UniProtKB/Swiss-Prot annotation:
Keywords: Calcium, Disulfide bond, Endoplasmic reticulum, Glycoprotein, Hydrolase, Magnesium, Secreted, Signal. GO terms for biological process: 'de novo' post-translational protein folding; protein N-linked glycosylation; UDP catabolic process; UDP-alpha-D-glucose metabolic process. This is Ectonucleoside triphosphate diphosphohydrolase 5. Monomer; active form. Homodimer; disulfide-linked. Homodimers are enzymatically inactive.
């Protein structure tokens, strides 16, 4: 569990959002994003909290945010964040929704300790599920969400009508982009040099950036673009979420097991795995048996050819990103840290080619890395192919890998929490 204290005037970003030009569904979403509130006269300093759950494919995470607003004329400050997570994700409980809800309750108990009792009834709690639940059938996903809703309703916190939901992947990208660029100071002042964001989850991956060239806007699919006003400027973002292209979904795709009815004792094999390996892996409530190619080749080259089939020609490649810089998090960060490309606590800056170099080292010497995840070669090779062949990044494209910016988690959850507080009229 971590806690941080940092005054951040994030509300300046979010309270000024308004739709200008957008894909139809997103236009409706942004219209409702932050309704105006009436500021009382002679109001005193107030402290308020927001509880946001991120129900991802590999784990469930709770973010407990503390805000302070000194007067109606001064925007709220982000005073601190408490963060914790549990594994596996809700989707692993697809056939046991009650157990999935129990994992949420364990995290919610932390909030009971963190939020003062006199503010419980004024503190909203919301869970937004991402790609893991999008991959489940509607019936199983709704069963999980219903159980979580019961846990919320039995708690002392404020439970909005839409307290549990499955969030569109593109909104993850939008909110994460706003959060990262605000926390890095890219949205203030006259000289704005925004950075793009790359998020690699277990089941999906997102890319979001601010196009600099009109050609990008003209050549991009219309549903990859969304616009809003902020700081008296209009931002037209390129953003898209690719379901099925997260790290763990890509493992299944490489093995030939994605969207496949798994037969009893069926074995999935890959040249990305150690030759003599035979093991079991549970993902999304399904058990998979996997192993290496005992008689075939192993190593980076045959592995890359396998992974290439998963990404080649499947993703849109805007030309201008080749010369842009991006913040990358989630599994980009984790795999880089696992292989000492970056410091686990501090993060670091890499070039795209650094992932390829490390993938070759791991894949061509699998025995040396046998104590690490058996999927390490496959994961690094997939990240390499995703960045180069999927998105079209150059070898020398710079990636800033980070878990936090100014001690705040790089996550869509902060933006979603402001949406929540504004929509409920909890801020002035």
């Amino acid at each position: 569990m971590t806690s941080s204290r940092l005054p951040v005037l994030l509300a300046l970003v979010f309270s000024s959002l308004s739709p200008v030009l957008s894909h139809s569904n997103r236009e409706m979403w942004f219209q409702d994003l932050f309704p105006p509130n009436t500021c009382p006269i002679n109001a005193k300093t107030k402290t308020f909290y927001g509880i946001m759950f991120d129900a991802g494919s590999t784990g469930t995470r709770i973010h407990i945010y503390t805000f302070v607003q000194k007067s109606p004329e001064i925007l709220p400050e982000l005073e601190g964040e408490i963060f914790e997570s549990v594994k596996p994700g809700l989707s692993a409980y697809a056939d046991q929704p009650e157990k999935g809800a129990e994992s949420v309750k364990r995290l919610l108990d932390m909030a009971i300790d963190a939020v003062p009792p006199h503010l419980w009834k004024k503190t909203p709690v919301v869970l937004k599920a991402t790609a893991g639940l999008r991959l489940l059938s509607e019936e199983k996903a709704q069963a999980l969400l219903s159980e979580v809703k019961e846990v919320f309703e039995e708690s002392p916190f404020l439970v909005p009508e839409d307290s549990v939901s499955i969030m569109d992947g593109s909104y993850e990208g939008i909110l994460a982009w706003i959060t990262v660029n605000f926390l890095t100071g890219q949205l203030s002042g006259q000289n704005q040099h925004t950075v793009g964001t790359l998020d690699l989850g277990g089941a999906s991956t997102q890319i979001t950036f601010l196009p600099r060239f009109e050609e990008t806007l003209k050549e991009s699919p219309t549903d990859f673009l969304t616009s809003f006003e902020m700081f008296n400027s209009t931002y037209k973002l390129y953003t898209h979420s690719y379901l099925g292209f997260g790290l763990k979904a890509a493992r299944l795709a490489t093995l030939g097991a994605l969207n496949t009815e798994v037969a009893d004792r069926q074995m999935f094999r890959s040249s990305c795995l150690p030759k003599q390996l035979e093991a079991e892996w549970h993902f999304g409530g399904v058990k998979y048996r996997y192993g290496g190619n005992k008689e075939g080749e192993t190593g980076f080259k045959p592995c890359y050819l396998e992974v290439l089939k998963v990404v080649k020609g499947k993703l849109h490649q805007p030309d201008e990103i080749r010369g842009s810089s991006f913040y990358a998090f989630s599994y980009y960060y984790d795999r880089a840290a696992d292989t000492n490309l970056i410091d686990y606590e501090q993060g670091g800056v890499l070039e795209v080619r650094d992932f390829e170099r490390k993938a070759k080292e791991v894949c061509d010497n699998m025995e040396r890395f046998s104590s690490a995840s058996p999927f390490l070669c496959m994961d690094l090779t997939y990240i390499t192919a995703l960045l180069k062949e999927g998105f079209g990044f150059r070898d020398n494209t710079l990636l800033q890998l980070t878990k936090k910016v100014n001690n705040i988690e790089t996550s869509w959850t902060l933006g979603a929490t402001f949406h929540l507080l504004q929509s409920l009229g909890i801020t002035y």
